[in-house]
Amino acid sequence: MRNLYLSVAVLVLATLSVSYQSCVSDVSANAVTPAKADPTEVIWHEIEDLANLQSKQQKPVIIDVYTNWCKWCKVMDEKTFSDSDLAEYLNDNFHMIKLDAETKSDITYADQTFSYIKSGRRGYHELALALCRGSLSYPSLVVLDEDNSILQVVRGYKDAAELRVLTVRS
């Protein structure tokens, strides 16, 4: 009887071991495979990465200055930036940057540190104010040349066709 229990225990342990190995290999197979960027979605970067991006490949830059509460910023994300043809065009021709105009983190850009300024109920980030040339309006798209000089600030909602026309002229 003791041998029977021992045999059953060994069989159960062997089965559990095989099942565990199968699960671990499935998980590690998924973990090793990096997700590739979908070329039909805009590839967004942080502004802190801009110098590194420009050192690898110089391109004009579009900075989407937004806030979390801005309805039209969300509509642009859902409709304009989700247009697959526009996304592919923007990814090919621009470094795309997202900047929350109310982020509370200090940001170092162009060897200068910018901070959050508490003002009223919300406040604003100094970098957003500087990029938007002193006039905050959401959404705002700031277009920079390859040397990161401001070419233009485009304020308000733009659909995919309008944005395509604006970026072709830049």
Which residue ranges define each predicted feature?
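Detector for the c-type heme attachment site
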Residues: K74-E78
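N-proximal helix/coil linker or "cap" segments that precede and/or mark the start of modular domains
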Residues: C23-E41, E126
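N-terminal post-signal-peptidase region of extra-cytosolic proteins
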Residues: E46-D49, F81-S82, L127
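A short acidic/small-residue loop/turn micro-motif
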Residues: Y157-D159
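Bacterial Sec-dependent N-terminal signal peptides
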Residues: M1-A31
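Thioredoxin-like thiol-disulfide oxidoreductase module
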Residues: S84-A87, N91-Q152, R169
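A short beta-strand-turn-helix
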Residues: V42-V61
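Short active-site neighborhood of thiol/selenol oxidoreductases, capturing the structured segment around
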Residues: Q57-K71, M96
